[in-house]
Amino acid sequence: MLKRLKEKSNDEIVQNTINKRINFIFGVIVFIFAVLVLRLGYLQIAQGSHYKQIIKNDENITVNESVPRGRILDRNGKVLVDNASKMAITYTRGRKTTQSEMLDTAEKLSKLIKMDTKKITERDKKDFWIQLHPKKAKAMMTKEQAMLADGSIKQDQYDKQLLSKIGKSQLDELSSKDLQVLAIFREMNAGTVLDPQMIKNEDVSEKEYAAVSQQLSKLPGVNTSMDWDRKYPYGDTLRGIFGDVSTPAEGIPKELTEHYLSKGYSRNDRVGKSYLEYQYEDVLRGKKKEMKYTTDKSGKVTSSEVLNPGARGQDLKLTIDIDLQKEVEALLDKQIKKLRSQGAKDMDNAMMVVQNPKNGDILALSGKQINKSGKMTDYDIGTFTSQFAVGSSVKGGTLLAGYQNKAIKVGETMVDEPLHFQGGLTKRSYFNKNGHVTINDKQALMHSSNVYMFKTALKLAGDPYYSGMALPSDISSPAQKLRRGLNQVGLGVKTGIDLPNETRGQIEPLTNNPGNYLDLSIGQYDTYTPLQLSQYVSTIANDGYRIQPHIGLTIHESTNKDEVGPLKKKINGTVLNKVNNTEKEIKQIQEGFKMAFNDKDGTGYVSFKDTVVPTAGKTGTAEVFQNGEPRVNSTYIGYAPIDDPKLAFSIVYTNQPVPPPWLTGGDLGRDVINYYFKQLGKDDKNKDKDK
């Protein structure tokens, strides 16, 4: 009896222990479920919208697509740069698209279009051979696979050795059909996920376009669309000034990557690379087309929707008058041939800039480079990117600097005579090599007196000329004063034109070479651009106000039609500075320029005496060397009409013969003035008829 009671008591103890453990386990389970319920509630209530957005993003992705750029027009609305539409085949890679799936699509597409295989590299072929023959590639690398497995070599070393083992025999296995597939496949791989990549946009035939369009449902990621190229209705005219746009394959050029990525561009965006296309990129670029792509769980694109059709870029109207531009080019071409026939066989550059002196509008600019045989190539950009010694054209600036620093007075007379310095150095004027002629400042400009400028420079240095004198030893301070005066009219400083790569010329230090200081005063030391010369003479014509030149005129909203859209912005030429001279001093320079072109003793009289409107200006000749042989640069600057200037110009011819024959380079300026004002008169008459 006691034994049974004892056994029963032990059973109860065991049962109680089991019950307690079961209760503990149930408690833990209940606690875990409670935590899970709370966590689930938190996810659904507090974080529900967040995860819904993630799911949504996985399913719907917005992608921007390129649109055509804005047009470039001349000041009268004539289209200079436009867009030419062309058919294109594109590919958009899905988020989870595999290489084998892309290859399958490429194989299907290769049966519908013909690709140019010239861009395929040897490395492309090797990679593709591995893609097509993975087992053969593996069999070539038995030893290396073991080394890769035990860590003896790294993956990049393995890959490098594999590529080195693939030779001509393997690459010869690739058929012409394989190369067609490869040409497509390499373009597919060039793009990023959900970023449309151009497969073919050159010479897409209507047959190809239609065939692909009909098979789109069987070609995942492939689409047919329209691409564009820039077209130039006036051919090569101003082609260099317009600049270039990158191709779809090129995207953002490497040297401009940081510049454009910082502005939110994508790497495969087509962008302006140079000159106007680059300068006005923000204006000419369009508003991208926005597409929404829907993907399934595997990441494949199942549908697309246009969220925003986008718009082509805004139109840019230029200050250029294309009719005047064409005339300047034709006259420059004619003048070059004429000068060569007169003996200028080594002339290698000829350039002209035409502008409105009062508002900075560039009306025309043309440059030509000439080789030994006389063949000419366009070099319009040279008008502001290349610099030359320009000679006596700068003398108006020298006199203004002399007035500013009280070195000379308006109307002051000096004797033009050979200057003899200590050490045997002699300097003289071209028009008066041995005589003694008393002239004033206006006459100095008319005759282009070197001596008057030398004496002005010496007075500026505090050392008036006397025969046998030693030149000043330290001319750093007077050189700075002289250059400051030249800078004020636009010589030796950038003009500020709205184009990249402008040069300010070559401005070398001047400290202990007084001979160079004297040469500076007559345009024989520092070098300047044709555009700087144009700004300089415009400053004289504009009563001392230096205006920033500009080639952009107005910006207009784009429209779906051919006409120019509503005005969005006017581009004005701002006043950069006014020369630090009195009205009387400026008038004196203007009078000297008038005499240079209209007095029978003036250096420009032969060419400019009979222009249809009175013209003022200055000529220049700079001594230079070409391949060690002495040559001269010839320059001409001017403006018209004298009383109310509407046009200013500069002309530069480089490396003409020495001693110079009588060359009629100034005739180009005369012919342009006559054309412009005759045409202006016709336009005014037509306007009167329309009233």
Question: What are these language model-derived features?
Answer:
Residues K52-N64, L324-A344:
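Short, basic/aromatic recognition patches
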Residues E65-S66, T98-L103, N201-Y209, K231-Y234, ...:
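Solvent-exposed, acidic/flexible segments
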Residues S100-K111, A210, Q214, R239, ...:
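Solvent-exposed, polar/charged alpha-helical surfaces in well-ordered, non-transmembrane soluble domains
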Residues G391-L400:
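Active/ligand-binding-proximal structured segments within catalytic/core domains
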